[in-house]
């Protein structure tokens, strides 16, 4: 028994047995996690089983696995594939005739990280849709152009929806000095009203803009990042667009809205327009999320300089690195839509 446990999991028999107790020792868990990070498949399988627990330890372990899966935490090459295969095996067990009513598998029947990772591994498209529906529920488009619905949630070219962007950006910026508004369409599809102008009118009239006011704006099936910020008490507006240049009508609508916020002089509205999406199809929402993450981390630095430098550096990445960004950022965004 000692030799078997040690060779499979690099744990002593007491450490292994302790994993199934109510109070798991930090030492045994740390040893197991280290082997998981190194890509040991037996340890990954064991940690995925621990993640099924519906207690603090189960949630902690599930988060560690997802951080490795999404690239937030570094592990061995292909660790994401090893983790999602382990989750898929659990999902298949949870849905067989014997186990399907077993409450121990609850996390594989709700919008959990474990279920999302299992869905990414299944080759069965109908199963992917079934799992996607459990995770997404029923979604409603906020604009006529917005693409939503229960399709392949793991498609590398899927458009991120308003609700998904909202949950991700609100979750990421909690406690930070950024005011992030619910994503909007620039122009109302039936009335033709400039929605950004309307929201700015309301904000200015009520409490005024914060020092860093963020809008994620949909312009005909495309997300752009909009930031109103202050430099020496002057309001500036920054538009970060990671695909083809916006048409002049769209730019005029944005400039008209910016005047309401106080960005009324020549040069107060700055457009950064660089196509970053060659290897990140329909990735405009991903870059909005990334822009917010960067500006949250850089604090008082010039946002124009930060996003220009980021864009230039991104274009220097290899195709493989850009493709990895696409995969990992989608996973990080979707994590905010999961309940455990």
UniProtKB/Swiss-Prot annotation:
- Intracellular or extracellular location(s): Secreted; Host cytoplasm
Signal peptide boundaries: none
Q: Which InterPro entries match?
A: ElaD/SseL-like_N, SseL-like_C
Which Enzyme Commission number(s) are listed?
3.4.22.-
The protein's enzyme class: hydrolase
The molecular function GO annotations come to: cysteine-type peptidase activity
Q: Which GO terms describe its biological process?
A: proteolysis
Say which domain of life the source belongs to. Answer: Bacteria
Residues at the catalytic site: 222, 284 (nucleophile)
The UniProt entry's GO CC annotations, sorted and at most eight, read: extracellular region; host cell cytoplasm
Please tell me whether the keyword Secreted is annotated for this protein: yes
Its keywords, alphabetically, are:
Host cytoplasm, Hydrolase, Protease, Secreted, Thiol protease, Virulence
Q: Does the keyword S-adenosyl-L-methionine apply?
A: no
- What family is this protein classified in? Belongs to the peptidase C79 family.
Protein's job:
Effector proteins function to alter host cell physiology and promote bacterial survival in host tissues. This protease targets the host cell ubiquitin pathway by acting as a deubiquitinase in infected host cells.
Q: What is this protein called?
A: Deubiquitinase SseL
Organism of origin: Salmonella arizonae (strain ATCC BAA-731 / CDC346-86 / RSK2980)
Whichever gene encodes this chain, its name is sseL
């Amino acid at each position: 028994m000692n030799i078997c446990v040690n060779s499979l999991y690099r744990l002593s028999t007491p450490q292994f047995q302790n994993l199934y107790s109510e109070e798991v020792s930090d030492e045994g868990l740390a040893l197991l996690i280290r082997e998981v990070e190194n890509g040991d498949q037996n340890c990954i399988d064991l940690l995925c089983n621990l993640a099924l627990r519906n207690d603090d330890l189960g949630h902690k372990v599930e988060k560690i696995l997802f951080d490795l899966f999404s690239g937030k935490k570094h592990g061995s090459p292909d660790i994401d594939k090893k983790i999602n295969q382990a989750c898929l095996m659990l999902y298949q067990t949870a849905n067989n005739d014997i186990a399907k009513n077993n409450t121990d598998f609850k996390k594989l029947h709700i919008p959990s990280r474990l279920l999302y990772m299992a869905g990414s591994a299944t080759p069965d498209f109908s199963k992917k849709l079934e799992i996607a529906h459990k995770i997404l529920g029923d979604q409603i488009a906020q604009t006529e152009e917005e693409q939503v619905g229960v399709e392949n949630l793991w498609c590398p070219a899927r458009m991120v929806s308003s609700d998904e962007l909202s949950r991700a950006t609100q979750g990421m910026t909690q406690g930070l000095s950024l005011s992030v508004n619910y994503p909007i369409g620039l122009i109302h599809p039936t009335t033709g009203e400039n929605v950004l102008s309307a929201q700015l009118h309301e904000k200015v009239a009520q409490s005024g803009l914060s020092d860093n006011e963020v809008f994620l704006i949909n312009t005909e099936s495309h997300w752009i990042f909009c930031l109103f910020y202050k430099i020496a008490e002057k309001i500036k507006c920054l538009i970060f667009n990671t695909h083809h240049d916006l048409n002049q009508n769209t730019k005029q609508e944005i400039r008209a809205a910016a005047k309401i916020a106080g960005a009324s002089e020549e040069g107060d509205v700055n457009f950064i327009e660089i196509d970053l999406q060659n290897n990140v199809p329909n990735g405009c929402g991903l870059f909005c999320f990334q822009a917010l993450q960067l500006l949250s981390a850089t604090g008082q630095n010039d946002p124009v300089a930060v996003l220009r430098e980021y864009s230039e550096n991104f274009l220097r990445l290899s195709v493989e690195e850009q493709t990895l960004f696409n995969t990992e950022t989608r996973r990080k965004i979707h994590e905010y839509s999961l309940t455990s």
